[in-house]
Amino acid sequence: EVESKIGVGSTFTVTIPCRIASQEETQAKREISSSDKKSLCGVKILLTEDNDLNAEIATELLQEEGCTVDRAKDGVECVDMLEKAANGTYQLILMDVQMPVMNGYDAATKIRRMDDPQKAEIPIIAMTANAFSEDKQAALEAGMNDHVAKPINMNVLVPTIRKYL
């Protein structure tokens, strides 16, 4: 419905038929929403990222999904933290590729050569702004399991993480 008066203005009225959701429907929706937010509850991730801001953002987003996150600032620190950790401490490593001291490719290669098979086989997901097919291939050749592009898109990262748990 439209009402209009020259020099005064117009009024538009729209009627949208709908029904009120039952209490059961709204409760079910709340439970689904709540379980989605904690979809990675209890997962401990070793985040290897040299950029403080990127690390802070990734940590916050992962914590919102229910993860516990430890951070390594470069590949050397990542390898060292994994070697010193008890088996099963980390379920997955998120690895930046371009870092000082030791890059992500070299760190992944060192991890895959560890004597402890449980640590050597930990899932490693490359996180990098380089999203070309050759970058993905380089990550796989270094022993990483998968590749996600930055900036982080949780609609991509969460299912990728789930795939390896």
Region annotations inferred by a language model:
Residues 1-165:
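C-terminal compact regulatory domains
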